[in-house]
Amino acid sequence: MELQRIFPLYTATGAARKLTPEAVQRLCDALTLDMGLWKSILTDPRVKIMRSTAFITLRIAPFIPLQTDTTNIAVVVATIYITRPRQMNLPPKTFHVIVNFNYEVSYAMTATLRIYPVENIDHVFGATFKNPIAYPLPTSIPDPRADPTPADLTPTPNLSNYLQPPRLPKNPYACKVISPGVWWSDERRRLYVLAMEPNLIGLCPAGWHARILGSVLNRLLSHADGCDECNHRVHVGALYALPHVTNHAEGCVCWAPCMWRKAGQRELKVEVDIGATQVLFVDVTTCIRITSTKNPRITANLGDVIAGTNASGLSVPVNSSGWQLYMFGETLSRAIINGCGLLQRICFPETQRLSGEPEPTTT
């Protein structure tokens, strides 16, 4: 995949070739906004090497060469080499950065760089790139294949471990629905979720770790074996710099009941042991109705999102005390989104993501 470039990338040819001011600014914006978290690959007194992965966006696509690996055609792997050469006399907090994409093409610049820890996650960092100045590539360019991503620091994440108490937006209606009880706040630029209290996990089937409402409803209301679309949704390991990860309900906030996602159905029968519905309601239910997404609002009230009925068709009150509103931090929210093609299309439609996910359904 290669998009037609709508602006020139370079100011010259040959050894003096470097990015134009417009291109290097776009590159900085892409590294800051469109990548996942950054994993430290190597740190020594001379150079710091970091790596990040995400789905390719229109902002980053002009810097990516034509890909021959059809298994990861929409994925970008960025490796950065950070140094402070004495002969450049760089200002404080400014570094020389070589950026490599997909182990094939590199660019050089200086930039004001801020690297900061991400709350509750070890070995990965957030990063911002500002005030870039393009430079020609040095004669000797490092090979990122010589510095593989450490295999022992790549756990399968459970997003429930990273939930934070919410700081509510002033306008709860300025949001996009990702799945029932999961929202992107346009105002706060972060994800908000309804999640059950940890003590309710004991009421769930063995091996169940999902606490976020969309994932719980997916388990309760989707067909047991899943459909091809559900089972083969592609995710990038944007939290740990992995080009791909195994699908699992705890690893992304995109999970939702299959027929709600694909067909816009809002009234769905429980597909598992109805006893498991007691994590949501004060008694067992056989049918759950999901609120319309046409006028969404971030809410801490479970009853604003779902309603349930029993086998006799009578309403069953929700278990509101067992569910709380949480949020993810801004940096982590952006990484979660950049690792999921569906979330990219919902949260950042203005960037016209390239992951090939279908358009979300409004119900």
UniProtKB/Swiss-Prot annotation:
Q: Which UniProt keywords apply?
A: Host cytoplasm, Host nucleus, Late protein, Virion, Virion tegument
Q: Where in the cell is it found?
A: Virion tegument; Host cytoplasm; Host nucleus
The record's comment on protein family reads: Belongs to the herpesviridae cytoplasmic envelopment protein 2 family.
UniProt GO cellular component terms:
host cell cytoplasm; host cell nucleus; viral tegument
UniProt function note: Plays a critical role in cytoplasmic virus egress. Participates in the final step of tegumentation and envelope acquisition within the host cytoplasm by directly interacting with the capsid. Upon virion binding to target cell, a signaling cascade is triggered to disrupt the interaction with the capsid, thereby preparing capsid uncoating.
The answer to keyword ATP-binding applying to this record is no
Where does it primarily localize? virion
UniProt-listed HAMAP family = HSV_CEP2
A Pfam family it matches: Herpes_UL16
Superkingdom: Viruses
Taken from the UniProt record, the cysteine pairs bridged by disulfide bonds within this chain are none
Q: Which InterPro entries does the record associate with it?
A: Herpes_UL16/UL94 (IPR004286)
Q: Kindly provide the name given to this protein in its UniProt entry.
A: Cytoplasmic envelopment protein 2
Q: How does it assemble?
A: Interacts with cytoplasmic envelopment protein 3 and with the capsid.
